[in-house]
Amino acid sequence: MSAKIILVFCAQALFVQSALSQCTSRATVAADRGIIGGYGLGAPYGLAYGLEAPLGLGYGLGAPCGLAGPAIDITPTIGGGLPVSSASAIAPVGLVVASENVYEGILAAAGELPFVGTVGVEGVLPTAGAGAVHHSCGDGINAMASRDAAFAPGYAGAHGIGLGAYGLGVPALEVPALGYRAGWRGCGCGL
């Protein structure tokens, strides 16, 4: 009877450890996430992503997107790679969004879809549109970036002359520190 109790107790301890374990970040605190690390007060090109970003004011004061750092670095969403399978001769290295739908007639699609490199369409299909690829690196995390309009009203639209969606000056005339949203990456996430 005592052997069964010990076995059940050990099994419960194993299940609790499995259920409550999580990977909170790819980097250690001493390596790159401290106050003087890559997102803090000292990094290449000066004070990257902190009080002064590589080309402007950065995401916030001391950490990206404010004072506490990005949620992706402290949530359990960072872990191992997402398993992707393919019948291709080249091994898959990322996430693939595929659609097997048939569209007939006129189709208008708008919005954002994160894609890293390629888009494939089979068959005869007259299309019009645009796509952009943005790769970020520095601490090993490859991220997609999306730029939304700033909260301050612009004088002449998206590329306005005032405090518009994309900066303090006409983009052709401005210096890099006066770029997107009052300092390359924004004065605290788009303010």
From Swiss-Prot:
GO MF terms, alphabetically ordered: structural constituent of egg chorion
InterPro entries membership: Chorion
Signal sequence coordinates: 1-21
Domain of life according to the entry: Eukaryota
GO cellular component: egg chorion
Keywords: Repeat, Signal
Example of a GO biological process term: chorion-containing eggshell formation
Protein role: This protein is one of many from the eggshell of the gypsy moth.
Family membership noted in the UniProt record: Belongs to the chorion protein family.
Official protein name in the record: Chorion class B protein Ld10
Organism: Lymantria dispar (Gypsy moth)
Organism phylogeny: Eukaryota, Metazoa, Ecdysozoa, Arthropoda, Hexapoda
